[in-house]
Amino acid sequence: MKNERKIVLPIYKIVYAVSFAVILSLVRGVTHTYEVGLTIEPPFAILAVVFCADTYVQEIMSRRSEIHRLYPVRKRTVSILERLLIQDIFLLLLAGVCYGLFFLFQTPKTHPVTESEWMQFGVYVGAITVTVFFWSVLANTLSMIFRSMWMGIGGCFLLWLASNSQSGEKLFGAWNVFSYTFREVENAADLRWLCGKALCLFVGILLLLLLPKQVQRI
């Protein structure tokens, strides 16, 4: 695990991820506290894509893939899973810090008809966990299929554009991968947005279950 951490968390990735979170909390203005989580989710999806797209293909770019292929499929699969886990944990910790930075740099007000601050944060943590998981797994999967980090990022970006828009909201409804962002914040009892997160979780787990077969192909 320590060796995998050194591979997937080099200094430059940590620096640009932290810089991204700081800049986001400075430039994206919010008025009410409920807007903080909604503001963070879509940009962090893109960060997860860029951050995790090279989870395996860096082996190809660094010419380590020939050595990597000598290992059993199970060991190679576990290696990729460990890398994804390490990156996701880092991104989730950063997402929590980013949430706090909005309160540090700005002074959002509590909306009178929304949940309590702790409830809002709890919902945000659950939603952003699924978001980071889904986009990181998808980015790695597409990169492995096309054997190109840029193709993986490009494919994810197309889905991001299609779903993170008013058209996407109307088309996908509660099944939108960004259902948390588009949910009715003034109606806490409306939990239909969980359908979108359940879909993300299902697809992400399915892609992980198919990972050994994908490893065999490369």
Placement of each model-derived feature along the sequence:
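Secretory targeting signals
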Residues: F20-D54, I80-G152, N187
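Terminal transmembrane helical anchor/hairpin motif
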Residues: V30-H32, E115, W150-I218
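Juxtamembrane transmembrane-helix termini
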Residues: V57-M61, P108-K109, R147, K170, ...
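Juxtamembrane/interfacial segments around transmembrane helices
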Residues: R63-R74, A95-L101, W135-S143, G173-V185, ...
